[in-house]
Amino acid sequence: MTRTIEPSFRESVDLMFNRAAALMDLPPGLEEKIRVCNATYTVRFGVRLRGQIQTFTGYRSVHSEHMEPVKGGIRFAMAVNQDEVEALAALMTYKCALVEAPFGGSKGGLCIDPNLYEEHEMEQITRRFAYELAKRDLINPSQNVPAPDMGTGEREMAWIADQYARMNTTDINSRACVTGKPLNAGGIAGRVEATGRGIQYALREFFRHPEDVAKAGLAGKLDGKRVVVQGLGNVGYHAAKFLSEEDGSRIVGIIERDGALYNTEGIDVEAVRQWIVKHGGVSGYPDATHSAEGSEVLEADCDILIPAALEGVINLSNADRIKAPLIIEAANGPVTAGADEILRKKGTVIIPDMYANAGGVTVSYFEWVKNLSHIRFGRMQRRQEEARHELIVSELERLDRYLGDAWSIRPDFKLKYLKGADELELVRSGLDDTMRIAYQSMREVWHARADVDDLRTAAYIVAIDRVSKSYRAKGL
């Protein structure tokens, strides 16, 4: 029997790109220019730790500079390699184009297991990596702007921003060199939750269109839908929390490194999160059935499957056993090209990663703009909005007194209406708007073209078209 070989992550991205590009009329040579990575840098540096020098290997890939700066996260993991960062950089290009964030695509990574080092050691390593990238202009507010990814967070972004500022003491925009920073270091409200919140907004927009929902063999709204989440990290946790608490979805399965939980009646996401923090995993959690094999829950009966961890978790070996009629890719590349083909033939609807997890880069865009403008969102207009609303409320109260029992103001109306939007509300509003418009641009292609039978191909067509127009505007 001939064994089918799974393509690499980079090859999977290229296969999906090629499928969409074949349906487009691009100028000769431009398809190749868009597809290939412009450059990938490998840096090796030493750090003296525990009495000896340890050498680390890091990468920063720049996929496309049709718009600058380029944008993309930095991940810390032992599995980081050139193929991975190039695939992720390519996805960043298409993702930014799809949601109309004015960036090219980039990605970086460091081969390291953060669990093996103390905090002060991680700071040394991160600062040195930042130094190696910054001196090559691979960290710069106007050229290359990193963000958090797997294994990194606000802490690492604060170290990187400070290291860049130390190296560029006269750059007034130094805080804009990286996004995903803590609020007290130039960050923005809502960045930590952004990708998970984007998943929620993406699903809400999908369920606003009954004909799209019907394609997945579903009906109705998010309320009551059975959801399985693979990976309860930052993205999976926030997506599951918001869907269960705000939309009435039922989280029936949670998959983690040490196994999985399943309960058809629903799982308390917050309780599981606290259990993981305390015990290091889901094993022993009392209010759900524990399975040592996460694959059992990945393949369980549910309405919505959210792969929110690593790439390639749904592949040729398990695609035909996936029962969920709707998959939303919270992680980057969780479905391989081969698995994607199997699932499409089964009729599974996949909301693709380049759209679904774009909440992170969207709010990073807002943070970058905030850093360049040197003022938080809402500072100039919030009180003025409240004053205008006060005039309306005063007039309504006068009418209330005049009309008596014939008409009255709801008790909580004044409190809600008088409160001007703060930064978090503005960020969420901007993210919601972005996710709605991006979905509608994909949906238009999906429904208008007979040769496009899935959202991923539609998303690639929209993104490639926008990138190609940027290159042609440059005279290429």
Question: Where are the predicted features?
Answer:
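Rossmann-like adenosine-cofactor binding region
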Residues: 259-350
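N-terminal ligand-binding/catalytic initiation module
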Residues: 1-194, 200-202, 206-207, 356, ...
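Adenosine-phosphate binding glycine-rich loop
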Residues: 3-8, 206-207, 321, 325-476
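General beta-strand structural signal in soluble alpha/beta enzymes
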Residues: 87, 171-172, 253-256, 306-307, ...
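Conserved active-site and cofactor/substrate-binding residues in soluble primary-metabolism enzymes
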Residues: 8, 12-15, 38, 80-83, ...
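Glycine-rich phosphate/diphosphate-binding loop of Rossmann-like nucleotide-binding domains
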Residues: 189-299
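Structural motif
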Residues: 59, 109, 143-144, 175, ...
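Flexible, glycine/charged-enriched surface loops at secondary-structure junctions
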Residues: 27-33, 100, 138-147, 171-174, ...
